[in-house]
Amino acid sequence: MWAKLFLRPSFVNRVHLTWSCRALLTMQLKTKEFESLFTDGLVGLAEIFQKNQFELRIAGGAVRDLLSGKRPEDVDFATTATPEEMKSMFQTAGVRMINNKGEKHGTITARLHEENFEVTTLRVDVQTDGRHAEVEFTTDWQKDAERRDLTINSMFLGLDGTLYDYFQGYEDLKNRKVRFVGSASLRIQEDYLRILRYFRFYGRVAAEPGQHEPETLEAIRENARGLAGISGERIWVELKKMLVGNHAGHLLELVYELGLAQYTGLPADGDVEEMKQVWQRAHVSSPKPMTVLAALFRKQADVENLDQRLKVSREEKNLGLFLVKYRRDLVKGHDEHDTMKPYTDFITDSREPDTQSKVLELLKYQGENKLLDELRRWSIPRFPVSGHDLRKLGYTSGKEIGTILQELRDMWKKSRYQMSKDELLSTLSQS
């Protein structure tokens, strides 16, 4: 197996640490998650780079995941080869290349054995404007690491299992610490979206809320205005990832404390206390991002304003409007034998196809976890009587048929949806 050719057998499930004069921490990794990456496609890719004497390493988030004992969903690669050199050797090897859009950023996507591999040339930032960067290619791994946002995302992993860590990212990962590479202000000013990326990774990595470095929070506060120039779509992508991670309630509170809300579409007068309470009772149920945000909104206009800034989906916007409208009015019933009745009646009466999913989010918002489990198991019953049934009985007036159908539906609901068509129609002959 190709992985075994690369890996040193003396370091099974442990590490070997060395320090170089350039403050490079190296370690030898051998885990089942790492070995599982070596598909026929990756073996073929590695052979091409080895044959042409270019280095190829796993980069960024995939390294972080592997060091955390996870198999990464996406694996990005970095190399000393330029895009032109990659194109030449892939063409020589008969490897198909797809998605040419990434080439200007140094990324070539090669397809081997029905797998896509994104390989990016090492880069340094020449000029940045807070949103995008002009880059030059380099063969210096440390310079590429210096341009990355967080220490835990700045590591490389050789295909022999050697970790290359220039900024103590591995130590930070072990200590569940999130730090910017070098100066937090400089990293943020290169791309202001890194403010929200910091929050997102804090929620993913940190063990507890409130363990931020003071200088990091101050850098975020000083650069908050930079988010005004970031597109709403990019902000929404990061916010959603933050909101489904750990500590989302704490991180949203920081968004307000550090003056970020006004630049991200959130209401200036957001109800932070309500949001903290909702997060406390709802996070165990994995609420959707909009469910958490809805707690900040005091009125439906806040949802509209958020949509204008972030361009949320129609489904997300409708969920926000629904929660703001019904969070106080649609609550569990007083009948101890059927506390779910108001919710099931609402769903049954609704003409919207996704009402049940919205009510599920409402129950998360309200912290009604027992009812949430019940409603997940509940199927929407079908009202057994139609206008056609009434016409067969001799009713002809459309208005009368509509009135009778509503009366029968109310009767059916009171029976907890148990009355059959015959039982319902039989009540007409009794009246």
Curated annotation (Swiss-Prot):
The source's superkingdom equals Eukaryota
Q: Which Pfam families match?
A: PolyA_pol, PolyA_pol_RNAbd
Q: What is the E.C. number?
A: 2.7.7.72
**Tissues with expression:** Expressed ubiquitously during early embryogenesis.
SUPFAM superfamilies from the UniProt entry: Nucleotidyltransferase, Poly A polymerase C-terminal region-like
One GO CC term, this protein: nucleus
Molecular-function annotations in GO: ATP binding; CCA tRNA nucleotidyltransferase activity; CCACCA tRNA nucleotidyltransferase activity; metal ion binding; tRNA binding
The positions annotated for binding ATP are: 61, 64, 148, 191, 194, 197, 200
Give the disruption phenotype, in one or two sentences.
Answer: Fishes develop normally for the first 4 days as they can rely on maternal transcripts present in the fertilised egg, but they all die of multisystem defects by nine days post-fertilization (dpf).
* Site note Involved in nucleotide selection, residues: 190
Q: Which residues bind CTP per the record? A: 61, 64, 148, 191, 194, 197, 200
Primary role: Nucleotidyltransferase that catalyzes the addition and repair of the essential 3'-terminal CCA sequence in tRNAs, which is necessary for the attachment of amino acids to the 3' terminus of tRNA molecules, using CTP and ATP as substrates. tRNA 3'-terminal CCA addition is required both for tRNA processing and repair. Promotes tRNA repair and recycling downstream of the ribosome-associated quality control (RQC) pathway by mediating addition of the tRNA 3'-terminal CCA following cleavage by ankzf1 and repair by elac1.
Protein name per Swiss-Prot or TrEMBL: CCA tRNA nucleotidyltransferase 1, mitochondrial
Q: Which organism is it from?
A: Danio rerio (Zebrafish)
